[in-house]
Every structure is written in structure tokens, then in C-alpha cells.
From Swiss-Prot:
Keyword Cell cycle: no
Organism: Aedes aegypti
Gene responsible for this protein: RpL23-A
PROSITE patterns according to UniProt: RIBOSOMAL_L14
Biological process annotations from GO: translation
Protein name according to UniProt: Large ribosomal subunit protein uL14
GO CC terms, sorted: cytosolic large ribosomal subunit
First and last residue of the signal peptide: none
GO molecular function: large ribosomal subunit rRNA binding; structural constituent of ribosome
Amino acid sequence: MSKRGRGGSAGGKFRISLGLPVGAVINCADNTGAKNLYVIAVHGIRGRLNRLPAAGVGDMFVATVKKGKPELRKKVMPAVVIRQRKPFRRRDGVFLYFEDNAGVIVNNKGEMKGSAITGPVAKECADLWPRIASNAGSIA
């Protein structure tokens, strides 16, 4: 029986190490007023019994704001991971990791709620999300 998946299509997402399981608290790197994001669920994870769903760079996840403006707190919203501490391998063989875990708040279409991103954005994320790439200060 064949495995389900993207089938390695051109322009598809390359498999990277997933460093942010459900329950992780990460920095919010945009100017929406949120300080950190709490990972509730990860989009597109089918899962396995007793395995926590986890997100990596470029993954969309469901989040809540734990610290930040009161109008953003206690609401469920989508977000995208732009940096992760866990090393992940690029196609050219280099292993890359960042000094923090960070994400940005988006809408369901992937358009950013804020208008600026602090710090670098991973190239893998910028390739998948053009609206995030356009607001990125630097792409690493």
C-alpha cells in the first residue's frame, strides 16, 4: 500500500525536522502587539497514537496569545513558524538553526495580520508564504 503525501511535487514542502510540539510557547515576531504564541494544533498533521503533533519552519498552526495586547489574548488564531531552534537540513546538505523559536500571526489565507517582522525569516518559510516574505527584513 502506498503512503499518502505530497508525492514530492515541484514547489512542495521539503520535509524538515519538527521542533515545536503542541504546548510550545514561541516568540511572536510581528508588530501586532502579541509577545508570544502558544501552539494548540498543527495544520495538516494526521498523526499517530500518543504522538504529539509538532510544527517546523513554514508550518501553519493554531495559536493563542499568552502575553500581549488584551484584544489579542484568549482568541484562537492561525500562525506560521518562521524560525526554530531545532537544526533542520537543507537540500544542499547544510544544517541550519536559529537562536529562538518564532512565529507570525496570519489569517486563513496566509496573509499577515501585522506589517513588519523582527529578525530573519527562514528561506523555507519565505518560499511557501509570499506574504510573509514580502514583510521580512531578512531571509536566511
